[in-house]
Each structure stands twice: as structure tokens, then as C-alpha cells.
């Protein structure tokens, strides 16, 4: 029991720390730590560590929504001499893409698949965001399908938050463009009703 709690706390602590781009890069240098998180997700398959692991992955892949700052607010902040947060150079697209690519190769989809049946719609949305980010890369879509990601995305596209459904549908569309449907969606016939729901 204590060991399980310790793992959960470690995952939640790392999820908070990965808001910092320097920590994201340091974590990505430690393949063992990432693989331990994947194994934790596959072993636990419960809500205890789901939030920490999935939030960490959202932070590392920058799959969260970025708030747009209106130009008027920017000018007002400058006038008031208020600090305006700048995006960290390690959160540039090249660095983020490299992190997503590495996570995809290391099998992060299997960790997300372990959690997709979670009752929390917020966790489901976060899973859809990360899977969609991995599906951005044509070469990784095969890994996503092999590890059960297309099945998870299909389920997430039909239930959960609107944003979660949208991300899941986009991930499915990306898979559908490049993968053989008989392989990506075995045994599933997509009905017109399902397509309209998505």
C-alpha cells in the first residue's frame, strides 16, 4: 500500500515539476524514468496514479491549450510594468516534436491505453490530447495502432468532454489517412451514425 502511494506521489510531483521546460528536457534524458512511468501505468490501471502520469505526459508534449494574449492586454501589462511570461526556448516546436517523437518510440501509447477507460472525463481528455500529439507524426501512427491507441481514440471520440472528443477524432482521422483501416480498426465497421457523432 505504501509503495503504491509513493509511486502515485512521485508521478504527481513530476507532473507538477514538468511545467518547467528545463525539467521536461532533463526527464527526457532519463529513458529509465519514462519507461518506469509506462510500466507503472500498465501495472496500476487505476485512478490512483492516472492523473499524475497523464498530466506529466500532457506537460512534456505541450498538449495543453495555450492561452492567447490579446494585444490590448499585452499593451496594458507593459504599461502597468507587469511581468509578461515568455515561452521558454525549450518549449519551441522543435524541442516539443523531439520529445513527442521519443515518447512515441518508447511506447507511451501503452501507458495511455491502460488509462483510457478511466471514469474521469478530464483524464480522458488529457489522454486524447497526448494521443493526438503522437499521431501528428505519420511514422508513429503504426506504433499507436500496435499498442491499442486506435481503439482508445475510437472510444474517447464518442464520450467525454467536447475538447476531448475533438482531439480523439483528430487523432483517429490522422490514423485513418495513413493506416489500412482493416489493421487500424480491426473488426469495426464504421456506421454513418458513428461518423456523424464524431
In which residue ranges do the predicted regions lie?
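Register-specific detector for alpha-helical tandem repeat solenoids, activating on a conserved position
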Residues: 110-113, 132, 142, 154, ...
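Buried hydrophobic core positions in alpha-solenoid tandem helical repeats
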Residues: 1, 36-38, 99, 108-116, ...
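Short sequence/structural elements of tandem HEAT/ARM alpha-solenoid repeats
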Residues: 26-32, 69-75, 102-110, 114, ...
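Acidic, serine/threonine- and proline-enriched intrinsically disordered linkers and terminal tails
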Residues: 54-111
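Acidic, Ser/Thr- and Gly/Pro-rich intrinsically disordered linkers and low-complexity segments
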Residues: 1-2, 45, 89-93, 112-116
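Alpha-helical solenoid repeats of the armadillo/HEAT superfamily
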Residues: 1-19, 26-29, 45-72, 118-136, ...
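Alpha-helical solenoid scaffolds in large eukaryotic transport, assembly, and signaling factors
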Residues: 21-26, 33, 38, 100, ...
